[in-house]
Structures are given as structure tokens and as C-alpha cells.
Regions:
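Iron-associated oxidoreductase/ferritin-like identity signal
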Residues: 1-170
Length: 170
């Protein structure tokens, strides 16, 4: 008879929750600003929904922290300088979309890794957060393709018309 020693799996650490919270707060700020500032109504709506998603994720992270007894999730508000570049128009729309896709993918990968070793009590939480990231990636990739067709896609106030009729001939 073989005996396998098992140790109870610990849940999410305060550091992991803090990392998720930090990412969520930063992403919320960027998505909210993009939703406020971009003239393209379709892209504006996409980023507004992303901001709602990040607020919901933040609330879930706070609830999870409370459930596991973590004492408040601290966050430093020094976000990436690249976010400033995006919001100030220092990056092209293509570069901005590529950066946002990369950032969402990075967190999605971290969440996938966490799901693989998480105890059952944390899996639903992590799967939910990972699916939100996956959905954001799909929509950002769609916008990136539209930017490749029209480099000023995020500026287009006539976005719906262009989707239906195509870009006018120059």
C-alpha cells in the first residue's frame, strides 16, 4: 500500500490578491479615461464596458480578500508610464491597442497559472476573472484589426457607418 502525504492547499495569498487588485484599479482608470476621451462611439462603448468589468472584478477581489481574512488590499497608485503615453496620445492607436492586448494577456496567463494550482474554493473566482480578460482580448483584437484597416479608427465618429459601408474611397 502506498501512502501519499497531502498537505492542504492554501488559498490565494494577500500578495496575489494585491496584485490582482492593483492591476484592476490601473486597468479601470485607463479604460474609463479612454471611454471618456475617444470620439468613436463603438470603441467608447467597448472601453466603458471594460471599465464596468474592472469595477465588478475589483468588488469581487475585495469580497475575496474579506472572505479569506486579508486585511484590506493596499494599492499603490503609480501606474505604468505607458498608460500616460496612451492617455496623452503619445502612442499610436495601433501601439496602444497592442499594449493593452499584451497587458490583458499577461494577467490572463497569470490567472491561468493560478487556476492550475488553486484549491476548489478559489477556482470559480479565478475562472471568472480569467474569462473577463479573455473577453477583453477578443474585443481589443477586433479593434486592432480595424485599426490596421484605418489607422484613425479610434477617432472615427462615423464608426457604425464605416462598419456597414466601408471606408470611403480617397
Amino acid at each position: 500500500m502506498t501512502v501519499v502525504e497531502t498537505t492542504p492547499q492554501a488559498g490565494l495569498s494577500p500578495q496575489q490578491l494585491a496584485m490582482l487588485f492593483q492591476y484592476t484599479v490601473e486597468a479601470y482608470k485607463v479604460f474609463e479615461k479612454l471611454a471618456e476621451n475617444l470620439p468613436n462611439p463603438m470603441t467608447r462603448a467597448m472601453f466603458a464596458q471594460f471599465a464596468v468589468d474592472e469595477r465588478e472584478d475589483r468588488d469581487l477581489i475585495e469580497m475575496k480578500a474579506a472572505a479569506v481574512g486579508a486585511r484590506g488590499v493596499r494599492v499603490t497608485l503609480g501606474s505604468d508610464m505607458i498608460f500616460s503615453d496612451i492617455l496623452e496620445g503619445e502612442m499610436s492607436y495601433r501601439e496602444s491597442a497592442e499594449f493593452l492586448i499584451s497587458r490583458e494577456r499577461t494577467l490572463q496567463r497569470k490567472l491561468r497559472e493560478m487556476i492550475g494550482i488553486a484549491p476548489n474554493a478559489d477556482r470559480n473566482f479565478l475562472v471568472y476573472l480569467e474569462a473577463v480578460k479573455r473577453a477583453h482580448i477578443v474585443e481589443l483584437e477586433r479593434d486592432l484589426e480595424l485599426i490596421r484597416i484605418d489607422q484613425d479608427w479610434w477617432k472615427r465618429e462615423d464608426a457604425e457607418w464605416r462598419i456597414v459601408h466601408g471606408s470611403p474611397a480617397v
